[in-house]
C-alpha cells in the first residue's frame, strides 16, 4: 500500500500494482493554515506517518504526525522553527539508523530534524559539487533523498 498527499491536502492510498485505483481518501486537517505539507515519510522506529508543514515565504516549518484513518495532523513540539528551503523541490526522508529526518532544499540547504522534539537537530553543510567537477559552483538539483533499510 502506498500513501501520498494530493495538491488539495488529501491523504490517499493506493496499491502499487493498481495505482489508478484510490483505496482511501481522507482530508488532512490540523496543519497551520499558512503552511503547506511539503514532505511525508513513515518513521521506521514507530510506523507513524510524519509530515513537514512549510511556508516558503517566511521559512516557518513544523513537524506533524498524520493519523492514517482520520487525516488529523498533530504538531510535534511546541513551536515552529525556521528553514531556508526555498520554493522548489524539497527532499524528506527518515534515516533509520539515527532516527532523524533528512531535509534538503532545491537551493542546496541541508538539515536534520528531530522527530521526538519536533525541531531542528542540525544544520549541515550546503550541498555542492566536488572540486574538479564540471558543475562546481552550481547548486545541485536534488529532487529526493532516500536511505537504505528505511521501511516499517
Predicted regions and their residues:
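Mid-chain, structured segments of secreted extracytoplasmic proteins
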Residues: 39-82
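Beta-propeller fold detector
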Residues: 21-32, 73-81, 114-135
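N-terminal segment immediately downstream of the Sec signal-peptide cleavage site
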Residues: 1-38, 43-46
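A surface/extracellular/periplasmic glyco- and lipid-processing/surface-interacting theme
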Residues: 97-104, 108-144, 148-152
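Short strand-connecting beta-turns/loops that link adjacent beta-strands
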Residues: 7, 45-46, 56-58, 97, ...
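Structural signature of eukaryotic scaffold interfaces centered on beta-propeller domains
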Residues: 38-47, 83-99, 137-152
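Conserved beta-propeller blade signature
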Residues: 1-5, 48-52, 99-104, 111
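Structural motif
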Residues: 8-14, 57-65, 107-114
